[in-house]
Amino acid sequence: LYHSSNTLAFDNFFHQVGQGKTADAEMMLENSLYGLPEGSAMVTDGTNNTFQSAPALLHQKLGYTTASFHGDVPSFWNRDNAYKSFGYQYFFSKSYYPKVKDQELGYGLKDKIFMKESMHYVEQLPQPFYAKLITVTNHYPYIIDKKNTSIDAWKTGDDTVDHYIQTAHYLDQSIGEFLDYLDKSGLRQNSVIILYGDHYGISNNHRPAIAQILGKKKVTNYDLAMFQKVPFMINAPGLKGGIDHTYGGEIDVLPTLEDLLGISSNKYIQFGQDLLSKNRNQIVPFRNGDWVTPKYTKYNGDYYHTSTGKQIKNPTAKEQKQFDKIQKYVTTELGLADKVMNGDLIRFYNLPGFKKVNKKDYTYNMKKSLKKLKKDQKKHKTSVKAKNNNQSTYDDYSTDAPELKDQNPSFPD
């Protein structure tokens, strides 16, 4: 997928999360708003704040059905409340999935099981739809059972680092199965697929092992800064693909998606920039105030030339002026974002053509949600299942997940 002619892959794309990690990433991707310097904005402000989020925008502007999928409990990171504030019509969490022996590891359903079983609901969503699937197997502490491993672990002596490659490979396989299904079901031909990593894989606490992986005696702050890169890919039919070297981060995803879908983001309160714009400044702020640009990098108080990794120990007056200018921009952006979040300032902004989300319009009660899903299918008749003469395409999804072998899972009705 990374090298597909229809995939734009960004190789200088960084996570920008703080303590909220996954929740901060969701806040940025759905709203182009930074998380907070401490805690999780989705937890502290997701319930009561007003947002102009991707689900609400796409539903109101383009008539999209909106749904999020996660194989864990709905209360984790306050999703069951924050998603209502974002305007998600559906939230398919752990209770929506059949109970299968050995189906869970770590933070929820194993990826291959989760991806396949999610299609039971995806095929019922009226098109067009905006669906977010959150996988968890390739997550710290990188636990994976032997029956799901197909490559050897690293041998650095650090258990966390050593098994990372195995869970990453498992995730890759699950995405491959998912894409095969999209091809078989016909969804691939009219879908924009975005794949992203929400936060760092291996923390800075594992420096000796990181050094071994990088083939170095020791790691520098520059190495650690570059270790904050995460995958970001956009795949769509007719999209002119390639490796894009633009510097950007999670805050930029929503404006980029809006550009691809023909939505102008100029009127929205968003802190990101369109990654496809020629006029973006390519300054990538980290939540702690550090930053990366194509020319310079600041990390843990040290400055580097980004292209070479050479440390700048005694900056010239010209370089220091540049550092100060970049730092002022980063500090200002983060400070303004904090004011927007802490003060719930979007509630004062009446955006023409956008109806503020009323959280009372949404429920994720399973019985009510499934009833609504059936009603929406009959009303719109645009779902994959409806277009297939109301026959399920679930069996078209092929997986080698050993847990599902000879299983016929029963979904809640």
Language model features by range: what are they?
Residues 1-413:
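Solvent-exposed soluble domains appended to multi-pass membrane proteins
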